[in-house]
């Protein structure tokens, strides 16, 4: 499987998603015939803490490459990923700090849910267009909530109702202990659909991967 990032890998900034689209999408651009997953760029945007402003419509931030002001919201993220023509597109979400207070976390997760619904609507529109390279592009929604079990579980239940192609658990391995991460996974996974793939984002040590597989994640 290939992994591309809408912002960090600079596919939107350089060479530009329109350039990739003109070349036939990422599979032809990379000469790769296996599945490709593209991240939404959300994590990388939110990692630019001093350079971005979060609004209901999306996020305004300054490019780390040339300093220009860029806007990215759910629709823009889906449009970029549609141009890239990946197999799986990740929904645009906010990845708050794991030490964010509970009130902020609850508000952030509620906004992420609203953004997810906008992602789903925009992907349905894009997949119906005649010039879309991959009209079968799949959408994965991302569970957030930091280390707060009740927020995580409620969010998992909400996004499970949207009947997406797959799901992911995000916002982990960002400073919390391994024990806290496993505690959250143990609480959240039972509330995500068993018949859909679930992707644990940003976790990559061998021990972490084995624990995730044991919990039925990929």
Q: For the regions a protein language model found, what residue spans apply to each?
A:
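Short, small-residue-biased leader/transition segments that mark boundaries at the very start
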Residues: 2-7
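Active-site-adjacent beta->alpha loops and helix N-cap segments on the catalytic face
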Residues: 11-23, 99-109, 127, 175-188
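Glycine-rich phosphate/ribose-binding loops and adjacent secondary-structure elements
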Residues: 113, 122, 126, 138-218
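Short secondary-structure boundary/capping segments
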Residues: 27-28, 131, 190
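Short, glycine/charged-enriched secondary-structure capping and boundary segments
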Residues: 18-21, 51-53, 104-106, 154-156, ...
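Flexible, glycine/charged-enriched surface loops at secondary-structure junctions
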Residues: 125-133
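Active-site beta->alpha loop and helix N-cap motifs at the rims of alpha/beta catalytic domains
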Residues: 8-11, 25-125, 143-150
């Amino acid at each position: 499987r290939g992994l591309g990032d809408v912002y960090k890998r600079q596919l939107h900034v350089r060479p530009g998603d329109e350039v990739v689209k003109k070349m036939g999408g990422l599979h032809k651009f990379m000469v790769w015939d296996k599945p490709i997953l593209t991240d939404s760029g959300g994590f990388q945007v939110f990692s630019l803490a001093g350079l971005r402003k979060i609004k209901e419509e999306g996020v305004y931030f300054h490019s780390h490459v040339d300093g220009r002001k860029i806007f990215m919201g759910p629709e823009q993220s889906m449009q970029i990923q549609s141009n890239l023509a990946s197999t799986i597109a990740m929904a645009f979400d906010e990845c708050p700090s794991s030490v964010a207070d509970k009130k902020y976390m609850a508000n952030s997760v509620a906004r992420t849910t609203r953004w997810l619904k906008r992602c789903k609507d925009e992907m349905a529109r894009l997949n119906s267009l005649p010039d879309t390279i991959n009209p079968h592009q799949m959408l994965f929604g991302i569970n957030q909530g930091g280390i707060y079990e009740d927020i995580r579980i409620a969010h998992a239940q909400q996004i499970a109702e949207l009947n997406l192609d797959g799901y992911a658990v995000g916002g982990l391995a960002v400073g919390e202990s391994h024990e806290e991460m496993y505690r959250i996974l143990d609480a959240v996974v039972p509330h995500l659909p068993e018949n859909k793939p679930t992707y644990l984002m940003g976790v990559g040590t061998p021990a972490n991967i084995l624990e995730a597989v044991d919990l039925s994640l990929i």
